[in-house]
Each structure stands twice: as C-alpha cells, then as structure tokens.
A protein has these predicted regions:
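Short, amphipathic alpha-helical "recognition" segments used to contact nucleic acids or chromatin
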Residues: 1-10, 44-52
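Structured, non-catalytic alpha/beta "coupling" segments that mediate domain-domain communication
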Residues: 2-24, 89
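RNase H-like two-metal-ion nuclease catalytic core shared by retroviral integrases
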Residues: 103-105, 190-192, 198-201, 214-234, ...
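C-terminal domain-tail junction helix/linker
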Residues: 206-210, 232-282
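Active-site beta-loop-alpha junctions of metal-dependent nucleic acid enzymes
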Residues: 140, 158-182, 197
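Basic, flexible linker segments flanking DNA-binding modules
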Residues: 23-123, 273-282
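Mobile genetic element proteins and their domesticated derivatives, centered on retroelements
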Residues: 15-16, 26, 47, 62, ...
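An active-site-proximal beta-strand-loop segment
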Residues: 117-156, 162-164
C-alpha cells in the first residue's frame, strides 16, 4: 500500500513536471475539474427533473428556474456555462414544425375591427386573446379552445371538445368570465373563425359587456399571442403528439395548462409565471 502511494506520488510529480506546473497546482487543477464535473452532473439531474414536468422547456427558462436551486448548493453558474452543459449532455430542445390552423371563415357572419392593435395594456383583465387548435388521438381529433389574458399571459379559459362547433368556445368563455374580478370587462380578440363570429358567441360577448375585436386579415399575425400559446402547449408540453385515447389527451391538456400557468416563466414577464403576475396585479 505504501509502495503504491509512493508510486502514485512519483507519477503525479512526473506528470506535473511534463505540464510545467507544481504538484500543488496539479492538485488544484484536478480538484477544479472534478468540481466542474460534479456541477455538470447536478445541472443534468435538475434539468431532467424539471423536464419530467415540462418536457420541452427552453434553456433560458430552465436557467431562470434552476439558478436559485444551484446557488442554494453553493454553485454559481453563468448562462453560457449552463448552456454548455445542456449541449454536452444532449439536453438542448430541437424546434418542431408548425401545425396547420383550424380557422374557418364564414363570409355571411359579422366581423369586427381590430381593437387591440397598438393597445397599451397596464394590467390583467384588459384584453383576452382567443383561439382554437386541434389535438390528435388514435380515436380521432379533439379541439382545444383557449382564452389567454394578453397582459399576464395566463390561460383564463379552456375547453377540449369533440368538434369545431361553437359550443367548445362557449365553454372556454364561460370559464374565463367566471374568473373576472370586480367590474373588469376585457376586450375579446380573436381571428375571424366562424365560432367567434357566430351569432351565439357574439351574443354572449355582448351580454357580458365585452368589446369585440377581430383580426382584419386572414392570417395569424394579428392574433400572434394566441398562436404563440398554442405553440408552447404543443411543443413544450407535447400536446402536438398523437395520444392513444381521447381521455388521455384531455388529462394532458389539463396538466399542461396548469404547468404553463404556474411553473413556466416568461421572458416578457421578467421571467415570472403568468399565475404570479395575474395574482400580483389583483
């Protein structure tokens, strides 16, 4: 044992000599390398743990979530090093292709002017963005109706239906209306889809005292926030996958909306979550 230790010391002295450094500095370097390895292992474990909840959460948002945890362990890691670890461990998220839309325009139905273009929002419940997207299952398509607060980014209403009929959008609207506080009456913004232009839906908006706003062109750019939320749910929470059962898809939607609202930080919100921003402004 003593001989082995002496041989190891001799080997270290020889290696340090070849590298042009003292044995003490060699040990420091080895300790630093081991420290970096341990830090990388911890980052990997934390990222995989968060990705178990939010499978496609991007690197910047992961960094914002995990920095306090790392600092609590005495680890100060810059963003560049954090991304290096993600790259080394194969944890960067590749982009997914965009999905086709679900907008159906009916020329005989009423249309409204775009009231949110250039609108300066100062708090929640001032404007909502509405949209419908589809969910694939082996049992057929489902259709997800969403209403998102345009200031806090919180999903305030949602419903998964079996068809593109207006009823699904009405259920999401009812949920959103139930969340309103006090006398707040947001502008309701959507595309020109027949669900939102239907007499039944427009009547419900007017009955609730909401102003009606629509895109003035048949493209997604004037309803970019709603499209963005659709993309996040499909790409980061795998709602763009094909589910075996409709029941599974509905459960996945419910979980995705909860995680999006309560755990996903947004750059536009100073890396706070929609739920926190919405509640803090109450």
């Amino acid at each position: 044992m003593i001989g082995d230790a002496m041989n190891q010391q001799a080997s270290i002295r020889a290696l340090a000599g070849k590298l042009g450094m003292s044995r003490q500095n060699f040990y420091k370097g080895r300790t630093a390398r081991r420290k970096a390895e341990v830090e990388a292992e911890l980052v990997e474990q934390l990222v995989r743990g968060e990705r178990a909840l939010q499978p496609r959460l991007g690197g910047r948002k992961l960094f914002k979530i995990l920095v306090p945890v790392l600092e609590n362990e005495g680890i100060r890691l810059g963003r560049d090093r954090f991304f290096d670890v993600l790259r080394e461990k194969g944890l960067l998220v590749p982009p997914l292709p965009k999905s086709p839309g679900t907008t159906r325009f009916e020329p005989s139905l009423p249309v409204f002017h775009n009231l949110v273009a250039g609108l300066e929002l100062t708090g929640p419940d001032q404007a909502w963005a509405a949209d419908i997207t589809y969910i694939r299952t082996d049992e057929g398509f489902l259709y997800l109706s969403l209403l998102t607060d345009m200031w806090s980014r919180k999903i305030v209403g949602f419903h998964v239906g079996e068809s593109l009929e207006t009823q699904g959008a009405l259920f999401a609207l009812a949920m959103a209306l139930a969340s309103l506080r006090g006398e707040a009456r947001p502008v309701h913004h959507s595309d020109r889809g027949c669900q939102y232009a239907s007499h039944q839906y427009v009547g419900k908006l007017k009955e609730a005292g909401l102003q009606i706003s629509m895109t003035e062109e048949l493209h997604c750019y004037e309803n970019a926030m709603a499209e963005r939320v659709n993309g996040i749910l499909k790409q980061e929470y795998y709602l763009g996958s094909c589910f075996r059962k409709k029941k599974q898809a509905k459960a996945a939607v419910k979980e995705a909306v909860y995680l999006y609202n309560t755990r996903r930080p947004h750059k536009s919100l100073g890396y706070e979550t929609p739920e926190k921003m919405h509640r803090a402004a109450a």
